[in-house]
Amino acid sequence: MSTARDRVESITPADGSVLGVAVIDVAGFVADLKSQAIDYGFHVHDERHFVETYSLRQLWEVDLHPEEACAGPIDLHLSLDVDPRALLGFEDEVMKMEDLDEEPPRGFTFPLLFTWTLPPLKYPPDLLVLATDIAGVGGLDLPVEVSAIDSFPSVTDAPERSLSIVARIALDLCDVYMNNDASVAQALDRCKHVSLYLLERADAWLDDEDDDDDII
């Protein structure tokens, strides 16, 4: 494992000038994130990377699902928003460090979002009960927000309810720089528990067996 000194010296020539290479390897972090997700029982099936040409803001997205739900109906969407201002500010602080092996200052963060998706629900749960239960499953390591959207396919149709289940953590660049993945590991562990909680109840929310009774 490389040290802080190795990483900084690798981008700092002998004359003291600084090359245009980032201190934080975001692509490497995303690769490690996918590897960790697999270790916690998720299957990764897609990845996207977007860059705004003007602001240089980046968005990394990873689509995965728990290995118990290969046939659906639950998917988990990870998104990492890379703010160039936070990244450049952190790099400036690292370059000011006299002892390159010490821990850099904290406070520079990227938001890492976890979003669960399910099909529209025929028998949606009570939102207050669901939010309370999921809050207990996610715990303090993964605060989860629950909301819902009702849509009408046509004016004569009954509403279809879709759940919005989102968790957000602040990814401190100090932890990324020091290869400290404890917070990410805790979040992925909680994500697996939330995914299994939803999977156990999804069939009842989606069940359409009663439709046969309405057919004449």
Tell where the protein language model's regions lie, with residue ranges:
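C-terminal basic regulatory modules in eukaryotic proteins
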Residues: P73-E145
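Short beta-strand-to-loop capping motifs
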Residues: A22, L64-P66, W116-L118, I169-V176
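Short, charged/polar micro-motifs that form catalytic or ligand-binding hotspots
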Residues: G16-V23, A27, P120, Y177, ...
